[in-house]
A protein has these predicted regions:
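Detector for methionine-enriched segments
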Residues: 1-2, 61
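Short, mixed-charge low-complexity intrinsically disordered segments
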Residues: 36-68
Length: 68
């Protein structure tokens, strides 16, 4: 079963998960510790994996920035 999809689009990578996750709270998206760490360390692979896990969407720019 595939949990997520990573698509390259021009200068960014889009990581998303089709189903909602337990990490999403009633106020909207809630960053997990793993995704927060990915934002700090700007690690594309970690951010993609974390985005799929928490059911959110992140853009991973070529210059290394991880943005919501």
């Amino acid at each position: 079963m595939m949990n997520g999809l990573v698509v390259k689009r021009g200068t960014e990578f889009l990581a998303r998960k089709q189903c909602r996750s337990a990490y999403a709270d009633e106020d909207g998206f809630n960053w997990s510790e793993e995704l927060q760490a990915a934002r700090v360390y700007q690690n594309h692979e970690t951010a993609c994996r974390a985005a799929r896990r928490v059911g959110g969407t992140v853009r991973l720019m070529k210059d290394g920035r991880v943005v919501e």
